[in-house]
């Protein structure tokens, strides 16, 4: 922590009851600092936590031409998930951009969608 602060970073501790960052508290703190946009880049657990909390407005998904499979294969989105396609989040205002061999899929999440409910 001291090294980060010495480098000019502001460090906040916002632990929730499970020891993880309390996401609404984080966003409230960012708002108080007049930060109104946040890029979340992380693994499946991080993506799932923000989606489950209904805190995602836009998705940028990078798709590489590689196929993974198997019951234990990693998923790009963790969290609660959905059992059936009808419960999946639907993205709107889609754009697709080719980046070399990869594809960038961008879309907006409807404001009323909340996976945890």
Regions found by a protein language model. Give the residues of each.
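Enzymes that bind and transform nitrogen-containing heteroaromatic metabolites
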Residues: 1-117
